[in-house]
Amino acid sequence: MVTVALSLALIVQGPPPETSTTIVTAHQWVVRLGAEVGDSIWPGFRPDTIPVLYVVRGQGTLLLGWRGALPEGFLPIAGVDRSGWLSSADRGAASTGTELAGHPTAQVVVNDSQSVAALVGLTTHEAFHVVEAAAKKEGRRFGQGENSFLVTSYPVFDPQNEAGMALEGRVLAAAEEADGRARKRTLARQFLAVRESRHRALGPELAQFEQLAELNEGLAEYTLVRVVQLAARRRDFPDRPGAVRLRQAKLAGLRTLTANVRLSIRLRYYATGPALGLLLDGLEGPAWKARLMNENLTLQDALADAVGYRTQEVALRRQAESTFVIARLRSAADSGVAGLRALRRAQVDSVLAAPGVQLVVTVAGRYLGLCGIDPQNLLQVEPGVLLHTRWVQACAGDFQATFNTPVVQDRNAQMLRAVVGADSTVKVTTGAQGEVQIESPLVSLRAAQADVSRDGRVLTVKIKN
């Protein structure tokens, strides 16, 4: 591959030529490998088709791989196809999957010390996040992402959990260096025993956080490692030393998984995720990738299946399913759930069809919270929709409402609906500053800023920020 130096004749200010050359060379390798061996990185993955924004801090933003007219503000670069330059760089930019002019785009923040191998990997990592975002679907783990807010409550001061995590890193490092499938299999089973024991103590919410972080950032980092691995096999790859350094750094990271206390614990899964992927490669080749997506697995689940870790559990479950005819039980459950859905919808229709004023409360730009519920009288109607059959207290900043009547809560639309009594019993008071007060024997509502409108029997209150 011929290294292309950028001609910046059309640009008032540009990145240093050496940085430009490194970026363009790295991107050329991503395009080449994506076109030739994209499926070897991940099934259906074509990083060569995803445009990339390279943010060069203090210099500007380099756009490569763009198809069509350049986005506003970008100038073409002579000698580099499908490229553009913007002579400004967002100081707050991070490497991530993003969107530019309506197109899914990878974004990479560049520093002067990054090698070609590092940029090939990082570009692929961020391009994979674009794929994950496109694949996101309700009920599917792949593309879902983890609840990052849980880093605020993760037990970093728990020595038992920290020791267990450190042990996992050592086992994974040994598995990566192990010769032969039998040794890798033994170490994989040891890892699973340590991981599942630690997760039982950690609790289901944080265990799920770790597993989803490994699917999200861990798999993206696996594609980073994998693409550099594939690049280094090519004789003309210009940065084999960088590829070796990357592998050594990954192994060192596993051996010191909990040592760098200055960094967020979320970065641990950038180490365990690719290590699990490489271990699965060594155990069963590429087949695990499609299986992980098709069967909605975590990396941990995929590894357990690959080494038969839960063979006895599976055999006993199948025996019970055969003995007690799981197909009949599932059919009955399907029928029961369908009936429950119909019943809940009928309950909602009945509640809202009651005579009187139907009050609709909506909140824009913030979450409609609950300050009080009666759990004994709360029913799920469908995902995100609840029926409070007796009493509920809602709140959102300077808005508060107490209902002594059935209320339908739609958490997706941030909306409450309830019939709050006959017209003659409902008193609405509004103030010059947008204050609203609604009183009836069934509701007491106050808001500092809201719009009120009436359409027939429907009284709508839109709470403002």
Q: Residues of each region from the PLM?
A:
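Active-site-proximal alpha-helical
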Residues: 204-234, 243-312
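Non-catalytic terminal regions of proteins
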Residues: 24-35, 260, 270-272, 281-465
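Active-site recognition of the HExxH zinc-binding catalytic motif
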Residues: 121-134, 221
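Post-HExxH zinc-binding segment in Zn-dependent metallohydrolases
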Residues: 70, 134-202, 206, 210-236, ...
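Bacterial Sec-dependent signal peptides at the C-terminal "C-region" and cleavage site
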Residues: 3-18
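Active-site scaffold of zinc-dependent metalloenzymes
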Residues: 70-117, 123, 127
